[in-house]
Amino acid sequence: MLGIIAPSGPLRNTSLEEIKFNLESYGYEVKFSESCSLNYKGYLAGNDDIRARDIEDMFLDKDVDIIMCLRGGYGTTRILDKINYDIIKQNPKPFIGFSDITGLNLAFYKNCGILPYHGIMAANVGKWDKFTYKSLVNALEFKDELYLENPKEEKIYTVCEGKAEGIIMGGNLSLIIATMGTKYEIDAKD
């Protein structure tokens, strides 16, 4: 089951019914958290306590296999200190999102060792193309090695010849900067 949470901004320009219909057309069962249907102060999907609790609840829910964020926006750095990371560490699941979700991706990696999926979000499911969906499935189902490729019409340019090894970590630069000097900051050593 795909659990959808809204740890940042509220839903805009689509409906939960449309999102559910589109995700089900890809074969997913869908469960929405409380925050998905909330709008708090016009720019948050619920108050900080609700959004933090929704994250914990989805990690605790044994029926949920994958957690995908509804959308980005603003607000994840407000809830980083409200999350019980032991819950997440003891119930690891793929966690997908980008933009403002970078704050959670960094915190989950730093505190729980969970490798985040910097990827598509549920509010955009109606705009997914075949390449996007195939990339999501490949990332979620890989066994040994994940092979990344660009769309055929997008050429890959090599900036520097050679090989590199390490952990690739990134996301929204403003969120990476916002976590610098905190316990959620990227360890860029490796």
Identify the meaning behind each predicted range.
Residues 64-66, 90-95, 165-166:
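Short active-site oxyanion
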Residues 11-14, 18, 50-53, 74, ...:
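Conserved active-site and cofactor/substrate-binding residues in soluble primary-metabolism enzymes
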